Amino acid sequence: MLVDHHCHLDFPQFSEDLDGVVARARAAGVGTLVTISTHIRRFDTYKAIAEAHEDIFFSVGTHPHNAHEELDIPVQEIVRLSQHPKCVAVGEAGLDYFYQHSSREAQAEGFRRHIQAARETGLPLEIHARDADEDTAAILLDEHSAGAFPAVLHCFTGGRDLALKAVDLGLYVSFSGVLSFKKAKELRQIAAELPLDRILVETDAPYLAPVPFRGKTNEPAYVVHTAQTVADARRITLTEVASATTDNFFRLYKKARRPTEVPELVVSATGAA
């Protein structure tokens, strides 16, 4: 089976067919999903989705786009909310210098607050880093000097240096459908180089659908295609990638539980032999 550790099931693209989205994921062999928070104040929405489906979990946190809106929420409130049994992660939080909907200062403050919450709870932090490799690395190094914390660089599109620094700090690196894009040659080289026991896969659905669905609404079932791209880059089988990334997920997301009924991975979904 595979895990999609980062999707946004509360987004309007899924409002009319969420049960169908979940069913298609299972049919493709995706047994566990994590719906990711972008606003702490929408906690009840994420919680409701997770509580309605046995194998869906959720996170608590503020996306860097929205950092300026929720700086009034203290770290201890994130810690308190994270105690829900199906809340398995903190975030997503981090730095986005591409859009900068929040100031860099607000993003950095929010990032550090979420790191503190991850450190206190032991839950992994879902890190968003776009066009901000240098500052992301600087904050990670600075914060690790104050105490280690579990984390993953989600939807990784950064450079080799950031990926290697993250792994050196004990973090994980996650690849999305971007990995399958024609121009992502350098990213595929990074996916081939990193230790397999530090790699995760995700969709970031409804965005960034992998080839051959690029330009369409992404959904968790399509994580199979990203996993196949990792396998191709490393010259190993999809089954090996699925096994490793699933084990990695449950090692990092310690509150998540493996599904009672493990769906069979549909290798043919990617055209693999």
Role assignments for model-derived ranges:
Residues 1-273:
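Mid-domain alpha/beta scaffold segments of enzyme catalytic cores
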